[in-house]
Structures are given as C-alpha cells and as structure tokens.
C-alpha cells in the first residue's frame, strides 16, 4: 500500500498510527524512518508485558498481511530492523494489517528470550 496521506505517511503507517492513538490509546506516537520502511515509536497506555517494570517507549513495525503471508517478515528482515533501532530496543511490536483495515499486534523479541517464571 503506497498511498500517501495524513501528512505524507504511507497509508499503512498512517492506519497503524491512528489505531495506536485512537483505539489502543498510545501517546507520543511518531514515525521512525528506516532505510526501506517506516516504523513507529510511542508509549502504550499500559505495560505490554508483566515482566516490564514500567511503561517505556515501544517500537512498532507496520506490516501488511500479504507481506506476512509471503514470508516478507523473516529473521533476516527483522535483524535489519533491529540494527536500525537503538541498542536498548530488545523487542518490536509487529502491527499486521489486513485488507479490511483490521490491525493485530504481535511482539517479536531480538535474539532468544527466556520463558518467564510463574
């Protein structure tokens, strides 16, 4: 989706940004330009994991469902994304959008993540 609106953002980035701000109630959401795509960063309304001590800045990678299905989201592609983000970023939230505008979120961690203790 390369339609441009909402201040020059691509349609996908604008869709995910609006979903984060208006439905998920994130604050301070802004675009992070990467080499070959756009990401977003912002503060969620609540912690994304029980392991988090406090609410911090999270990075979101908008992805179309067709990219996800066609293996456009590979470990290599995610490594490239992590290499362009601050070293303190240990996870990225994938925002997968379908053709009807529905957005679902999945968390992807950099490297291996130990299972949490109950």
Curated annotation (Swiss-Prot):
Protein name, UniProt field: tRNA-splicing endonuclease subunit SEN15
Cystine pairs: none
SUPFAM superfamilies according to UniProt: tRNA-intron endonuclease catalytic domain-like
GO biological process, one term: tRNA-type intron splice site recognition and cleavage
Lineage: Eukaryota, Fungi, Dikarya, Ascomycota, Saccharomycotina
Alphabetically ordered keywords of this record: tRNA processing
Stretches of the chain forming a coiled coil according to its record: none
Function recorded in the entry: Non-catalytic subunit of the tRNA-splicing endonuclease complex, a complex responsible for identification and cleavage of the splice sites in pre-tRNA. It cleaves pre-tRNA at the 5' and 3' splice sites to release the intron. The products are an intron and two tRNA half-molecules bearing 2',3' cyclic phosphate and 5'-OH termini. There are no conserved sequences at the splice sites, but the intron is invariably located at the same site in the gene, placing the splice sites an invariant distance from the constant structural features of the tRNA body.
A Gene Ontology cellular-component term: tRNA-intron endonuclease complex
Species of origin: Eremothecium gossypii (strain ATCC 10895 / CBS 109.51 / FGSC 9923 / NRRL Y-1056) (Yeast)
Regions crossing the membrane: none
Molecular function GO labels: nucleic acid binding; tRNA-intron endonuclease activity
Family: Belongs to the SEN15 family.
Signal peptide (UniProt feature, chain positions): none
Quaternary state and interactors: tRNA splicing endonuclease is a heterotetramer composed of SEN2, SEN15, SEN34 and SEN54. Interacts directly with SEN34.
């Amino acid at each position: 989706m390369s339609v441009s609106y909402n201040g020059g953002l691509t349609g996908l980035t604008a869709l995910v940004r609006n979903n984060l701000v208006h439905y998920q109630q994130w604050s301070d959401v802004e675009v992070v330009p990467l080499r070959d795509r756009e990401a977003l960063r912002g503060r969620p309304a609540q912690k994304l994991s029980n392991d988090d001590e406090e609410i911090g800045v999270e990075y979101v990678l908008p992805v179309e469902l067709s990219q996800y299905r066609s293996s456009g989201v590979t470990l290599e592609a995610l490594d490239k994304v992590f290499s362009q983000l601050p070293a303190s970023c240990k996870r990225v939230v994938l925002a997968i959008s379908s053709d009807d505008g529905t957005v679902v979120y999945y968390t992807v961690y950099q490297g291996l993540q130990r299972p949490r203790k109950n």
